[in-house]
Amino acid sequence: TDRQLTVAALQGNAGAGGVFLSLAADYIYARDSVILNPHYKSMGNLYGSEYWTYLLPRRVSKSHVLSLTRNRLPIDATDARNLGLIDDCFAVSSEEFVNKIRQTAESLAKRPDFFALLQQKAHKRKLDEQLKPLQSYRDEELRQMQLNFYGFDPSYHVARYHFVHKIPHSWTPRYLAKHRRL
């Protein structure tokens, strides 16, 4: 929306959709203990459909988009901040974090340039829409998702079954078990 600024506050770990939901906010903060998994691949090569193809490149470079989504590795809040994925992280308790976010949001609302920030946000969104409408991102993501659901590769359905029925992996996935690559 171009009538308000939004803040995402991550107190706990987030995977795929949770990470990309937070990227829809204007400002993103996390506790320093938070671990993010900004990818869907571990769910049977799922492509994802939360406008991530629009949101992620707004925050990180193209090379980081590729490494984050292809390598399937978790990232801690400090590294996420250093990449620009989130705006900041704080080494505080849950209660202190809530207070810190409240203070940050109140400070943001009281900024003398608040309305200029809203105008900049609206202008950027308008330019983005002219370059490529949000609907195009949605259509492309859903086309890829359709392949996950109805294509030749059954890995999504197997991963979904295991996820729904809480069946753990039989072994550590190879992309995490680097010692097995010898």
Model-derived regions: residue spans:
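Glycine-rich beta-to-alpha active-site loop
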Residues: 1-43
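Glycine-rich beta-to-alpha transition loops that act as phosphate-gripper elements at the mouths
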Residues: 9-14, 68-74
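Hydrophobic/aromatic residues within transmembrane alpha-helices
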Residues: 21-22, 80, 145
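Well-ordered beta-strand positions
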Residues: 26-27, 67, 71-73, 79, ...
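C-terminal long alpha-helix characteristic of the crotonase
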Residues: 30-31, 47, 86-156
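Hydrophobic, secondary-structure "cap" segments at the distal end of domains
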Residues: 53-63
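Patatin-like phospholipase
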Residues: 153-157, 164-182
